[in-house]
């Protein structure tokens, strides 16, 4: 079983991430993790923080000479901006005069759409700073780092992932657009909005420009695809063991995500049954699904087809034009607190979603096949696939459906 935890605040000295349960012998490359951390900063419409904030990665446990040891993997991501926040975020008590000034002023105007007000109510804070520091999407850097390790584990078993942007605001790729594959990651990362359709990407850029001009923000939809999965990950026997339920929970746990669908999801709900499911045919001695409408899961289990999950991100709640709120120190109406923010962070959300899907799939693989070393896990996987009787055999799909 794979377990992961993160710790740290947005403007604290560092983020800490721990991954427990990873088998020994998995390649763990600090450079590969840094590359994913850089991908998390991609996207047209990002704020100034992405330009000056550096992620100083350090692998502090669980890895020796580039390979996992089977013990917990510990990662640290230093915050290059920490010197500016030493007093405000100090773990030690600080004299009031050291907190004087704009940066140290209490944040008593909770921002609509953020965790501010509910967090203040829940934890008994009289200002929003303690809430927003942990609720911030900065925390996702730690999960992206862990996801890079999980993806390396999956890659050793022939499982690969890719994410891309389906929509920004009202601008959406056509429903019949070609699915990207992991071979397209470089091209996607080079696109301003990580969109696989160039014409749609250009219209997305224009939409971001318009929102920026209006002092507004945008959300959108991203999609993660996983290729090469074996059938049978997850289970139908209990609700919490269903793979699609675990994926939905992981994606909903990403900041600003408000909806998740698997495969064609809500579109499937508009179809008749004769047009909603993936028919089975025999080809070259194997059972083949003619389409991928279900998104690679049936009955809470992977089918061996392409896994396809989507997540809808709401527009960023820190709106430059400032939404209305109440100053809880005076009980009077006031504009919400505004700090530098993005116009659109949907492309980055795709990278975070990719990491979360990788972690969930890695856990599902270990739950099914176990193994204290990557070699043992791989042997168990091969033995399982070999044991499936010939009349039930399906192919592990490593390319989009025709």
UniProtKB/Swiss-Prot annotation:
Gene Ontology molecular functions: chorismate synthase activity; FMN binding
Presence of the UniProt keyword Plastid in the record:
no
> Can you tell me which residues bind FMN?
134-136, 255-256, 299, 314-318, 340
Enzyme Commission number(s) from the entry: 4.2.3.5
What are the alphabetically sorted keywords of the record? Amino-acid biosynthesis, Aromatic amino acid biosynthesis, FAD, Flavoprotein, FMN, Lyase, NADP
Listed binding positions for NADP(+) are 40, 46
InterPro entries, A to Z: Chorismate_synth (IPR000453), Chorismate_synth_AroC_sf (IPR035904), Chorismate_synthase_CS (IPR020541)
An annotated GO cellular component of this protein is: cytosol
**Known catalysed reaction(s)?**
5-O-(1-carboxyvinyl)-3-phosphoshikimate = chorismate + phosphate
Q: Which pathway does the protein contribute to? A: Metabolic intermediate biosynthesis; chorismate biosynthesis; chorismate from D-erythrose 4-phosphate and phosphoenolpyruvate: step 7/7
A single GO BP term for this record reads: chorismate biosynthetic process
Q: Which cofactor does it need?
A: FMNH2
Q: What class of enzyme is it?
A: lyase
Cofactor binding description: Reduced FMN (FMNH(2)).
Task of the protein: This reaction introduces a second double bond into the aromatic ring system.
Q: How does it assemble?
A: Homotetramer.
Q: Which family does this protein fall into?
A: Belongs to the chorismate synthase family.
| Protein name stated in the entry | Chorismate synthase
Q: Which organism is it from?
A: Leifsonia xyli subsp. xyli (strain CTCB07)
């Amino acid at each position: 079983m794979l377990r992961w935890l993160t710790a740290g605040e947005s403007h604290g000295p560092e983020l800490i991430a721990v991954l427990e349960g990873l088998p020994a012998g998995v390649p763990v490359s600090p450079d590969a993790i840094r590359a994913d951390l850089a991908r998390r900063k991609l996207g047209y419409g990002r704020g100034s923080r992405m330009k000056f904030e550096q992620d100083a990665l350090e692998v502090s446990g669980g890895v020796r000479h580039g390979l996992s040891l089977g013990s917990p993997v510990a990662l640290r991501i230093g915050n290059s901006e920490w010197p500016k926040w030493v007093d405000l975020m100090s773990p030690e008590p600080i004299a009031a005069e050291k907190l004087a000034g704009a940066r140290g002023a209490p944040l008593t105007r909770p921002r609509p759409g953020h965790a501010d007000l509910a967090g203040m109510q829940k934890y008994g804070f009289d200002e929003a700073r303690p809430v927003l520091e942990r609720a911030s999407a900065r925390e996702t850097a730690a999960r992206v780092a862990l996801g890079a390790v999980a993806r390396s584990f999956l890659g050793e078993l022939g499982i690969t992932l890719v994410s891309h942007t389906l929509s920004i605001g009202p601008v959406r790729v056509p429903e019949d657009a070609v699915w990207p594959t992991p071979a397209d990651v470089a091209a996607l990362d080079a696109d301003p909005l990580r969109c696989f359709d160039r014409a749609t990407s250009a219209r997305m850029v224009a939409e971001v420009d318009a929102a920026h001009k209006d002092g507004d923000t945008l959300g959108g939809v991203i999609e993660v695809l996983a290729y090469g999965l074996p059938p049978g990950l997850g289970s139908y026997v209990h609700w919490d063991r269903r793979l699609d339920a675990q994926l939905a929970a992981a994606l909903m746990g990403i900041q600003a995500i408000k909806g998740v669908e698997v495969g064609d999801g809500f579109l499937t709900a508009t179809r008749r049954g004769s047009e909603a499911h993936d028919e089975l045919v025999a080809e070259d001695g194997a059972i083949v699904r003619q389409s991928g409408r279900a998104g690679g899961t049936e009955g809470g289990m992977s089918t061996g087809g392409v896994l396809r999950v989507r997540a809808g991100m709401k527009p960023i709640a820190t709106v430059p034009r400032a939404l209305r709120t109440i100053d809880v120190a005076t009980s009077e109406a006031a504009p919400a607190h505004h700090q530098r923010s993005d116009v659109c962070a949907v492309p980055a959300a795709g990278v975070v979603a990719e990491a979360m899907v990788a972690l969930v799939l890695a856990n599902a693989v270990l739950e099914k096949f176990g193994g204290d070393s990557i070699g043992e896990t791989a042997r168990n996987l091969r033995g399982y696939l070999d044991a499936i009787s010939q009349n039930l055999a399906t192919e592990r799909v490593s390319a989009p459906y025709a």
